[in-house]
């Protein structure tokens, strides 16, 4: 009997232990969600929204802070623990500063990607550990009953929750590192030219451009709810609080304050004044009360106000989004597909990708000379232009983009460098002047062959010319020689250097005088 009772007792203890462990009843499981601090009553829940929705247009109710210059080696966050007095109340908390927010700050969905879509809730530790957060706090508001993420949430460039234009305080970082605080229209949230890479919604804009902005924020976020008293109580009650903002150096600032609603902690006015003393320029209030949680290096470092299932202990609440400070990361992580992430910085591949995210094409100062498009392989020239910077007109005989097409005109005459039209009528340039005098030039390959043929022709003609010149020289010399010989002979005749031979002697006849003398001597009758 005693042994059976003992076995039953052991079984009962084991069963109770299993059930308690399954339900987290030993002080390390789920909280009771008993320290609830809501800006609006549960009945209203702002389903229809008491304030104005803004879908289009650009509001003037936000502040943009340019990204701070990158400093080598200044990547690790600074975490300060404090115990300060507010109206004679000792209040502990943590203040975190993180340089280069674009690369060191992220908004995380509960339990990882897809958490908002599945309306998941998880403790800050559960969300922060897989993401390698050095510092993590709870983020935006959510519905306690359903786990639905409220307001705008952009995590790593992905929009996972929409406020639908509802005007609550926002804090986000755009792709170029600009810090944005305030109220945004739906159009501004959806901007694609410089989109948000991180964004979350809070309630109440605490500090705007170095001044407390709580009164204006109450009027802007919800006028009618002030009449119920719930929103006014949310602002003025002491409780655990969290906030996010930035200082004048462009560093991200996270504030966490321990407390319990109506018993310990601070109100929003006290939190705003404290942040002003820390040189904070813009800041918004995030979820507080039992949601306020601070995790350092993956370990809970705050005192939650929610009770565990066993009232002896306090347990961290399962919340929605988480704000995370981590080691520098490339933004986006894949460097837009055009680079490699090394020590938090994108090393761009190729010769023309530039920018912190390797998302900008840069073909040099000339920018393709306004005659082409910069691509990842260089300038793609418009029709009629060529060269590495698209600064050269097409040579005669070529046309089209990059001057890749030969003209198809007769005799390889020039064509329009843009259209290839053989009726040349482009603006007067050196090329057109050549065309006007009908000088047609073939493509470069034909020109080379023509030059070789021309060289051969010139050589042949030179040889022929030299031969003819030589023959002419010989002929001239011969003619000169003959001429000089004839002239010498003529001179000899003129000088008397000759013998007279009568023609009769040559013919065997006597001259007439001699005949007469011979006749007289033989005639006896001649007197």
Curated annotation (Swiss-Prot):
It is a single-pass type I membrane protein. A motif (NPF internalization motif) lies at residues 523-527. Residues 485-527 are cytoplasmic. Residues 1-25 form the signal peptide. It catalyses: N(4)-[6-(N-acetyl-alpha-D-glucosaminyl-1-phospho)-alpha-D-mannosyl-(1->2)-alpha-D-mannosyl-(glycan)]-L-asparaginyl-[protein] + H2O = N(4)-[6-phospho-alpha-D-mannosyl-(1->2)-alpha-D-mannosyl-(glycan)]-L-asparaginyl-[protein] + N-acetyl-D-glucosamine + H(+). Glycans are attached at residues 209, 215, 297, 367, 389, 421. The chain crosses the membrane at residues 464-484. Homotetramer arranged as two disulfide-linked homodimers. Interacts with AP4M1. This is N-acetylglucosamine-1-phosphodiester alpha-N-acetylglucosaminidase. It comes from Bos taurus (Bovine). The lineage of its organism: Eukaryota, Metazoa, Chordata, Craniata, Vertebrata.
């Amino acid at each position: 009997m005693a042994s059976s009772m003992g076995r039953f007792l052991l079984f009962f203890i084991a069963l109770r232990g299993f059930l308690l462990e399954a339900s987290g009843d030993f002080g390390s499981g789920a909280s009771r969600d008993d320290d609830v601090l809501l800006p609006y009553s549960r009945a209203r829940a702002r389903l229809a929204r008491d304030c104005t929705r803004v879908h289009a247009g650009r509001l003037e109710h936000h502040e943009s802070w340019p990204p701070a210059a990158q400093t080598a080696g200044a990547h690790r966050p600074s975490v300060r623990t404090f115990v300060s007095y507010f109206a004679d109340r000792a209040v502990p908390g943590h203040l975190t500063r993180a340089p280069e927010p674009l690369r060191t700050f992220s908004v995380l969905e509960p339990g990882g990607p897809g958490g908002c879509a599945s309306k998941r809730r998880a403790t800050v530790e559960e969300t922060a550990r897989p993401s390698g957060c050095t510092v993590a706090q709870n983020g935006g508001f959510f519905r306690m009953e359903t786990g639905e993420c409220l307001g705008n949430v952009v995590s790593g460039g992905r929009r996972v929750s929409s406020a639908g234009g509802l005007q609550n305080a926002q804090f986000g970082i755009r792709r170029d590192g600009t810090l944005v605080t305030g109220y945004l229209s739906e159009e501004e949230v959806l901007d694609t030219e410089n989109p948000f890479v991180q964004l979350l919604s809070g309630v109440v804009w605490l500090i705007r451009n170095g001044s407390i902005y709580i009164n204006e924020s109450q009027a802007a976020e919800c006028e009618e709810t002030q009449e119920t008293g719930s929103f006014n109580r949310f602002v003025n009650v002491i409780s655990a609080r969290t906030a996010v903002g930035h200082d004048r150096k462009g560093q991200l600032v996270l504030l966490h304050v321990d407390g319990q609603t109506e018993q310990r902690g601070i109100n929003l006015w006290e939190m705003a004044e404290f942040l002003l003393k820390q040189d904070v320029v813009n800041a918004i209030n995030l979820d507080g009360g039992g949601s306020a949680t601070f995790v350092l290096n993956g370990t809970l470092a705050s005192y939650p106000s929610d009770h565990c299932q066993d009232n002896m202990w306090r347990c961290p609440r399962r919340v929605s989004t988480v704000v995370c400070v981590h080691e520098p990361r490339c933004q986006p992580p894949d460097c837009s597909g055009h680079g490699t992430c090394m020590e938090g910085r994108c090393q761009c591949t190729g010769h023309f990708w530039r920018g912190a995210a390797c998302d900008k094409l840069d073909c040099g100062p000339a920018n393709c000379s306004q005659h082409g498009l910069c691509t990842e392989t260089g300038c793609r020239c418009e029709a009629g232009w060529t060269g590495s910077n698209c600064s050269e007109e097409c040579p005669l005989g070529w046309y089209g983009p990059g001057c890749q097409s030969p003209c198809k005109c007769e005799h390889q005459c020039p064509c329009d460098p843009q259209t290839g039209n053989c009726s040349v009528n482009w603006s007067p340039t050196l090329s057109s002047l050549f065309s006007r005098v009908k000088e047609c030039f073939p493509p470069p390959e034909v020109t080379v062959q023509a030059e070789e043929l021309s060289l051969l022709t010139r050589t042949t003609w030179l040889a022929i010319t030299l031969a003819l010149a030589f023959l002419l020289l010989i002929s001239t010399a011969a003619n000169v020689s003959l001429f000089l010989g004839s002239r010498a002979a003529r001179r000899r005749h003129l000088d008397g250097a000759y013998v007279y031979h009568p023609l009769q002697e040559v013919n065997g006849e006597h001259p007439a005088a001699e005949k007469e003398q011979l006749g007289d001597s033989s005639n006896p009758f001649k007197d």
